[in-house]
Design a protein with these regions (language model features):
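Non-catalytic substrate-recognition and accessory regions of acyl/acetyltransferase enzymes
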Residues: 1-57, 61-153
Length: 153
């Protein structure tokens, strides 16, 4: 797991990567990118990518790392993301996936004038969702405990 972060004018831009390093080769399994601003609702998640040939639980590991980092290194308590609308209906699957993680729908961002700022921030229209970082972290902790893995940390 690698966390990259840079701060500009009070905004923290981050990238969290899960990868395997072997013999000078790096195989990336997944990553999440986003930014924070100094507010309890300041964790903004922009890009999530999980490769299809990734080992099990890479997604959960990325989410747990993101929530732990936000809770420990920022004053953020809640995260927001936008499931972007697309032509093939993939956004419905994303909304279902994000709900399973612990997010809830807060607004459908469309083409109305009141949505203009959100469209500029997020880069498109879609389903805006919000999640409580502590609740998501607790849910992931329970899932990891139920795996009954015997690997030392």
């Amino acid at each position: 797991i690698k966390i990259q972060m840079r701060e500009v004018f009070g905004l923290k831009f981050f990238r969290i990567v899960v990868a395997r390093i072997t013999n000078n080769s790096v195989k990336i399994f997944g990553e999440i990118k986003g930014w924070t601003y100094p507010n309890k609702n300041g964790l903004q998640l922009d890009t999530l990518r999980i490769l299809s040939d990734s080992p099990e639980y890479v997604s959960e590991l990325i989410w747990a790392t993101t929530m732990a980092w936000a809770l420990e290194q920022t004053n953020c308590e809640n995260a927001r993301l936008l499931a972007i609308y697309d032509e093939d209906g993939y956004s419905k699957k994303l909304v279902r996936y994000f709900r399973l993680i612990g997010f809830r729908v807060t607004k459908e961002v469309g083409s109305s004038p009141s949505d203009l700022l959100l469209r500029l921030i997020w880069g498109g229209a879609g389903t805006l969702m919000k999640g409580d970082c502590r609740k998501i972290m607790s849910k992931l902790e329970r899932k990891f405990k139920n795996l009954n893995l015997s690997y030392p940390a």
